[in-house]
Structure formats: structure tokens, C-alpha cells
């Protein structure tokens, strides 16, 4: 189904800690987003950014490293209530900051170039982040705050091996790091081949619906992955399909949102 070759899963376990999708994943999503922008939107985006979406996609990660902007760390996370609904109005939540940034872009004539730049950078990053399942928190489900499980290589005896895997890094970097031998452009094209038939379906809705949709994926994933569980490699790999789907949704939805804003 996919043209990407199968890489040894254990190699991806050496992944660096990430704060959301790692840079490679962000760049891949951004490339796929750019592939789905109409010409008018491309020109409007370039006029504001003075560069490409791909080159600006991790700006918010850089911003949070500034001690004076440490409060923005919470913007990378998205809270759902116990019913899986996005109802929060907390200024520290990612969905609220995303909605504020969208409002600026929809009312550009009343905002400075600097404000538009900050807003566009924020939209680019947070639409992507809300599709990283480890950044969705659900009230009453403690596991969504993070946990560690173990992966088993499905061998017994002397060949048996197990290693720790964090919930955060599984979605942030483990799967995408399996494809870093390719460029973000190539990876984006591969995802598009897999997902393009679902583009119209994936592009529907608005940001709060997207977070709720992700919350449903989180609940399903936690049925197989939980604190202290020993999980066979092949079971973990079944979640790679969902990771790819999340990246596709992020790109198609971001493109649809920007095309609508700049129509």
C-alpha cells in the first residue's frame, strides 16, 4: 500500500525527546500542506511569512525556549472534557490560542503585519500539533498525561528483548523517525498517495471538531497501550497507520483552513 520501505522498528526507538511532532514530521506535514494550497493562498501566505510554511513550521517550538515566553509551552496541548468534547476557554489551552490566531487572520485589515505574522505562524504550528495524539488530554483519563510501556520483539528465550517506549515519543517521533532516510517532500508525497482519496472527508470541520476527532483516536489507542503493558512489536506497528492518518489530516485540514481564510 505504501512505497516506503520497512525499516527496523527498533532503530526508531533511539528517537530524541520531542515536544510535539518532531521537526521532520512538522516539515513533512508542511510540505503536504503546501501541495494543497491554491495559488491565491500561496501568494498571501508568502506575502506574510516572506518564506515558506515549511521553514516557519516550528517557530512556536523555538519561541517557548525563550524564558520570557515559557508560558506558551501549554499552548501545545489540547484539553477535552470527560465526554470527549472541546469546551475549554482557558487562555493557556492550544485550541483557544489557535482560535485567537485564526480570528486575527480573518480580520487582517485591523491588524499589523507583525500581528499577522505571529498569527499565521501560530496557526501553522498548532493545527499540526493538535493532530499529535500525545498532545490531547482527556479529563478523567490519566494516561493521556503520559506513561511508559514496554515493547517486546516477539521472540522468546535468549532472543527475547524488551525496551521502554513513552506514549509521548511514540506519536511525536518514533514512527516518523522510521522515514528520515527520505526528504520531507518525498515523505509528504508518499502520505498523499495513501490518503488523497480521503482528502475531502479529512478536510471537513473546524479545529474543535478536529481535537475531538483526535480524542476518539486516543481512546482507541489506549485500549491496547497502557502503563506497564508489554506490547508485541506488531501490535505497536498497527498504530503507525493511525499516525500516518493524523499527519494527512493535519496537512489537508491546515490547507483547507488557509484556503478559506485567504479566499
PLM feature spans:
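Bacterial Sec-dependent N-terminal signal peptides
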Residues: 1-24
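N-terminal, motif-rich segments that launch catalysis or mediate targeting to/interaction with membranes
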Residues: 19-126, 133, 138-263
Amino acid at each position: 500500500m505504501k512505497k516506503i520501505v520497512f525499516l527496523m522498528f527498533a532503530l526508531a526507538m533511539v528517537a530524541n525527546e520531542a515536544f510535539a511532532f518532531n521537526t521532520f514530521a512538522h516539515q513533512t506535514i508542511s510540505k503536504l500542506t503546501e501541495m494543497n494550497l491554491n495559488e491565491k493562498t500561496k501568494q498571501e501566505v508568502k506575502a506574510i511569512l516572506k518564506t515558506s510554511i515549511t521553514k516557519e513550521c516550528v517557530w512556536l517550538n523555538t519561541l517557548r525556549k525563550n524564558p520570557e515566553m515559557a508560558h506558551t509551552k501549554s499552548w501545545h496541548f489540547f484539553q477535552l472534557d470527560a465526554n470527549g468534547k472541546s469546551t475549554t476557554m482557558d487562555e493557556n489551552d492550544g485550541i483557544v490560542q489557535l482560535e485567537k490566531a485564526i480570528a486575527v487572520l480573518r480580520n487582517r485589515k485591523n491588524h499589523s503585519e507583525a500581528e499577522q505574522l505571529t498569527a499565521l505562524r501560530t496557526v501553522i504550528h498548532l493545527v499540526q500539533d493538535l493532530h499529535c495524539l500525545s498532545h490531547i488530554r482527556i479529563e478523567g483519563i490519566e494516561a493521556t498525561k503520559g506513561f511508559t510501556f514496554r515493547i517486546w520483539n516477539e521472540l522468546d528465550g535468549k532472543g527475547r528483548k524488551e525496551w521502554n517506549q513513552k506514549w509521548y515519543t511514540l506519536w511525536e517521533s518514533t514512527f516518523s523517525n522510521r522515514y528520515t532516510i527520505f526528504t520531507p517532500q518525498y515523505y509528504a508525497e508518499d502520505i498523499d498517495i495513501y490518503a488523497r482519496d480521503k482528502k475531502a472527508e479529512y478536510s471537513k470541520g473546524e479545529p474543535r471538531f478536529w481535537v475531538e476527532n483526535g480524542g476518539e483516536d486516543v481512546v482507541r489507542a489506549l485500549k491496547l497501550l497502557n502503563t506497564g503493558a508489554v506490547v508485541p512489536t506488531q501490535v505497536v506497528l498497527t498504530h503507525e497507520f493511525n499516525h500516518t492518518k493524523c499527519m494527512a489530516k493535519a496537512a489537508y485540514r491546515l490547507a483547507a483552513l488557509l484556503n478559506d481564510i485567504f479566499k
